[in-house]
């Protein structure tokens, strides 16, 4: 079984992120095309992102969905931007940036 995993790096709000994209997950065609995308913050290592508190996210989707965004990088950037508008993320981000004296 030949696997085709593409790797991309982006910078999002000062966080370096690695995107690993496998358009045909495990090379399987089982009547539904399954793609796999992994998102990991690498600098700072495992930094929180709006789509994951651990800095890592594994996501299965359709390759057509990702293609509709213009590819894996555009898909992840759109996902991050959308989720970064959520009130919980904005509050948490503000708290992380706030200096603490204790």
Question: Model segments located where?
Answer:
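Amphipathic, interaction-prone secondary-structure segments
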Residues: 3-35
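Acidic, low-complexity intrinsically disordered segments
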Residues: 38-102
């Amino acid at each position: 079984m030949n696997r085709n995993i593409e790797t991309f790096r982006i910078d999002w709000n000062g966080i370096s992120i690695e995107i690993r994209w496998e358009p045909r997950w495990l090379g399987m065609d089982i009547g539904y095309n399954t793609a796999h995308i992994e998102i990991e913050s690498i600098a700072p290592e495992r930094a929180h992102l709006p789509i994951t508190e651990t800095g890592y996210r594994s996501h299965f989707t359709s390759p057509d969905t990702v293609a509709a965004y213009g590819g894996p990088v555009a898909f992840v950037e759109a996902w991050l931007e959308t989720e970064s508008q959520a009130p919980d993320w904005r509050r948490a981000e503000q708290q992380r940036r706030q200096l603490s004296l204790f």
